[in-house]
């Protein structure tokens, strides 16, 4: 039912201003100086060539229509998926929570791991609506700001 998550992430970075990015059925904001890259299923914004920081939103079709009464069952699947992603990255899930994102019940995880010799945090948030899964990903170095990640999670809107 759930799409496999690819590596991506959220960053700390301080660009002047904000940029609103629109995808199919959603919008979100990024720091104004970040470069936006679009593919068929994903919009990603990166801080810069030498930074590990990035934010991304991917859309995946669900086999069945998500219904709120299925939340507890779906949450267990999401927990397993987050554990698998952490294992693939040789990291660990350091935080998990159910919260509201874009007016929908969502599941958020923080995964800590090493990437290119640096300690990073990757936040994944799964938002389900109808027959679509929205996967919000953000990555930043542990020693740097999580502001871009916070901006992604707080600005994400379904349209």
Model region roles, listed by residue range:
Residues 31, 75-82, 149-153:
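Extracytoplasmic/secreted envelope proteins and their assembly/folding machinery
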Residues 3, 25-29, 64:
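Intrinsically disordered, low-complexity regions enriched in Ser/Pro/Gly/Gln/His and often acidic
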Residues 37-134, 140-143:
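Conserved polar/disulfide-associated segments of primarily extracytoplasmic proteins
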